[in-house]
């Protein structure tokens, strides 16, 4: 069994309250460096890439460099996903750590929060990050996410401000009308700096309408490990509703070999959603064929 990526949640703390994220039901928790090391030692048998995120922001951690050092020691590549609010907490030595292959910045975090920061104050460290990447000729990818193309008037003004700022900074013409009409997946701002577009999605919940069967990438391309050590089948199960096991009690190999895990894998291969949460998840419709 191999995965393209394993999501390991260093912390479930993000410091924000974005309207597009689910209300956190689990207590605030940060995975210790020692526990993280024990998990990575097991995870490297299944993948070569770790995403340090489920719902928390890894950049809230002042000792992020320690976690990245561990990933480098185990020859893993890393993806960091952040709101962008905590970039100033870290040096470029940390942000451009040799283990980091990509940094994702969720640009929707600004307009979906009440904040004292001005738009310019929010964007400035993001643009500086891009400038430093260009200056260093660093091979890292910077992925600027704007996942609101299904929104209409409520997002238009914010998007236009972003497009204007990026147009000036990168010397590229970004026209809101054209983007909304053509709906590109990505626009290249500079070498390995991409503006990535998508739609908001509904997080799975037992309170959601019944969605039926279907395929999923969970337990196929990836699994996720929450800050508590619980293993879940996909990166959207942020509350651990489908806790396949706890790494404080069992090994990853044992957890991935249980009847429950194997039945989920078999079900998805047959386009069946075995677990109740999966039956109430609309995200899997993206993988229907």
Segments predicted by a language model, with ranges:
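A short, flexible beta-alpha/helix-coil linker loop
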Residues: 25, 110-112, 262
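C-terminal accessory region of radical SAM enzymes
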Residues: 135-141, 171-211, 236-286
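Conserved AdoMet/S-adenosylmethionine-binding subsite of the radical SAM
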Residues: 61-206, 212
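Conserved alpha-helical substructure of the radical SAM core
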Residues: 1-103, 114-121
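Short, acidic, Ser/Thr-enriched surface-loop or helix-capping motifs
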Residues: 225-226
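Short loop/turn microsegments at loop-to-beta-strand junctions
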Residues: 219-221
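Short cysteine clusters
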Residues: 14, 18-21, 216, 234-235, ...
């Amino acid at each position: 069994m191999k995965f393209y990526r394993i999501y390991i949640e260093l912390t479930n703390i993000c410091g924000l309250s974005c309207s597009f994220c689910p209300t956190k039901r689990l207590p605030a928790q940060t995975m210790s460096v020692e526990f993280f090391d024990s998990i990575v030692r097991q995870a490297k048998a299944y993948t070569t890439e770790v995403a340090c995120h489920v719902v928390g922001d890894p950049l809230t951690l002042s000792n992020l460099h320690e976690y990245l050092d561990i990933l480098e020691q185990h020859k893993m590549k890393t993806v960091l996903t952040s709101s962008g609010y905590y970039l100033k907490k870290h040096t470029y030595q940390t942000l451009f750590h040799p283990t980091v292959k990509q940094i994702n910045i969720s640009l929707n975090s600004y307009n979906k929060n009440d904040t004292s920061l001005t738009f310019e104050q929010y964007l400035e460290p993001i643009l500086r990050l891009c400038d430093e990447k260009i200056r260093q000729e660093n091979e890292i990818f910077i992925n600027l996410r704007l996942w609101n193309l299904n929104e209409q008037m409520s997002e238009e003004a914010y998007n236009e401000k972003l497009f204007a700022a990026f147009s000036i900074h990168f010397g590229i013409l970004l026209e809101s009308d054209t983007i909304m009409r053509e709906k590109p997946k990505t626009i290249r701002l500079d070498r390995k700096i991409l503006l990535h577009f998508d739609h908001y999605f509904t997080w799975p919940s037992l309170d959601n309408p019944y969605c039926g069967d279907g395929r999923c990438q969970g337990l196929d391309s990836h699994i996720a490990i929450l800050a508590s050590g619980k293993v879940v089948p996909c990166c959207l199960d942020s509350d651990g509703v489908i806790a396949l096991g706890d790494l404080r009690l069992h090994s990853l190999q044992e957890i991935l070999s249980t009847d429950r895990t194997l039945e989920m894998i078999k079900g998805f291969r047959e386009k069946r959603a075995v677990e109740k949460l999966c039956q109430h998840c609309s995200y899997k419709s993206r993988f229907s064929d």
